[in-house]
Amino acid sequence: PVNIGGALVSNASLHNFEEIKRKDIRVGDTVWVQRAGDVIPQVIGVIKEKREKKLKPISPPEICPVCNSKTIRDKIKTGKKEKEEKYIRCTGAFNCSAQLIERIKHFSSKSAFDIDGLGEKQIEQFFHYKWINEPSEIFELEENYLQDLLEKDGWGARSVENLVNSINEKKLIPLEKFLFSLGIRHLGECSS
């Protein structure tokens, strides 16, 4: 980890594999990192003077590191031409725990259901406990795991009550937020 603008950073975004190729980033490179918008750390380039000879280019992953499913790049038709999409994705879908967790995070994100007190850390914790395996199970937490939650470190009566109230407040949301929460490919926040 390094300190960038007062924040301790251990990961930085490269967006997609095309960025890795475009910036010619290799395993073992020393890179420049900035916090985009003073928030998200991103790799902006390689310090080529520090590059050791014979560093290997990064190969696109062929297997998901989480579920061992095959990875693919979808084809996009633009007129008569067909090209590969920028993004490499795992084909594991509901068999990939990383995808399930990210789907739940997306569902409860600010642009979707926006459930106060249910952030990334809590979602990962509840997934680990096997309390939430899909987004709809968020609404069953109170009924199924309220007592268990009270017994977990960091959860008192007040924080559990606040979470339950937050979840109950979000049972009805605008249609566009609900559509966005579903995580349908190519249906972004604006188009929903």
Model-derived features with residue positions:
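Short, structured beta-strand/loop micro-motifs enriched in basic residues and often containing a Trp
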Residues: 4-18
